[in-house]
């Protein structure tokens, strides 16, 4: 019967295996997307709540010390603000796609989601990279510009920022994996098996 229609049995078996692989890739996507949502939401919340105060004696007048309180907040650095916004957008987007994934099953919407995933990956990667750059500056300073490191005085602020950065970079890696899964699931049949 298959030979009458012009298909060989091995081609049918290969097509069946390809569909099984695509089905597995499609069922894996919501799990990875949920992990991306959690990682980016944790990063946004931790950095958004990151604040520490440090009080030091700046002078002694007579016998009374004069103290000054310094506060480190994420809002003081535009890179950290961008980091929080990028992670919040990424977590909101992934939550929206998780909620509406039944509607987005058709191929046209699936390709739109794939393109938006690439945009979100780019936004998330740039937000994480800019925040990592500022975190490195806060930790090590810049001796040429005479910017002293601040992590020796604001240890908790720097530790929370580091946790947020790690969570965000995990989100970037998972978002990249999600893009690869989506590309493989949306690819033509010949590209999935490497034929």
Curated annotation (Swiss-Prot):
Cytoplasmic-side segments: 1-25, 100-114, 182-195
GO CC aspect terms: plasma membrane
Keywords for this protein: Cell membrane, Membrane, Transmembrane, Transmembrane helix
Membrane topology, Extracellular segments: 47-78, 136-160
Cystine bridges: none
InterPro entries: CASP/CASPL (IPR006459), CASP_dom (IPR006702), CASPL (IPR044173)
Pfam family, one: CASP_dom
Main location: membrane
Cellular compartment(s): Cell membrane
The keyword Mitochondrion is assigned to this record: no
Family stated for the protein in its record: Belongs to the Casparian strip membrane proteins (CASP) family.
This protein's name: CASP-like protein 1B1
């Amino acid at each position: 019967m298959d030979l009458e229609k012009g298909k060989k049995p091995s081609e049918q078996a290969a097509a069946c295996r390809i569909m099984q692989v695509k089905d597995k890739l499609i069922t894996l996507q919501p799990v990875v997307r949920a992990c991306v949502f959690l990682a980016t939401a944790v990063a946004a919340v931790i950095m958004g709540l990151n604040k520490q105060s440090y009080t030091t004696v700046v002078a002694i007048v007579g016998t009374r010390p004069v103290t000054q309180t310094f506060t480190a907040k994420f809002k003081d650095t535009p890179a950290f603000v961008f980091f929080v916004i990028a992670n919040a957008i990424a977590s909101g987007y992934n939550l929206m796609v998780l909620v509406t994934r039944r509607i987005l099953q058709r191929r046209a919407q699936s390709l739109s989601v794939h393109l938006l995933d690439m945009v979100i990956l780019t936004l998330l990667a740039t937000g994480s990279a800019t925040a990592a750059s500022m975190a490195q500056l806060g930790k090590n300073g810049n001796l040429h510009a005479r910017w002293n490191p601040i992590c020796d005085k604001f240890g908790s602020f720097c530790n929370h920022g580091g946790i947020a950065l790690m969570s965000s970079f995990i989100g970037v890696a998972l978002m990249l994996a999600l893009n690869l899964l989506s590309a493989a699931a949306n690819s033509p049949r010949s590209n999935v098996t490497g034929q």
